[in-house]
Amino acid sequence: MGQNQSRDKQKAIQNQPKDTGNRADIIPDATGMGPEFCKSCWFERRSLVACNNHYLCMNCLTLLLSVSERCPICKLPLPQKLKLTSSPSAPPSPSPPPYSP
């Protein structure tokens, strides 16, 4: 009853792919792309993330990542890094506003 990991688990950790910089595409709005929906909830068409051969919305992706690292639809690893196609809409602030209690 030790605190050490089993040999199989240690090998699995060592065999995991290193961070290669691959990021999943995020589609802000898929209304003009045809029948593209989240394959988990079949409702959302915004903030879709490419997961291998299908799309997941951000809500479903967050929920699925809290349960497992594998996609229940394609059984492949879920995307954990996203590639933004457009810059954020909020301008950067040069300095934070002064603190006032």
Swiss-Prot record:
Q: Name one GO biological process term.
A: viral budding from plasma membrane
Give the start-end ranges of region Disordered.
Answer: 1-28, 82-101
Q: Cross-referenced InterPro entries, in alphabetical order?
A: RING_finger_Z_arenaviridae, Z_RING-type_Znf_sf, Z_RING_Znf
Q: Does the keyword Zinc apply?
A: yes
Q: Does the keyword Transport apply?
A: no
Motif range (PPXY motif):
96-99
Q: What is this protein called?
A: RING finger protein Z
Gene responsible for this protein:
Z
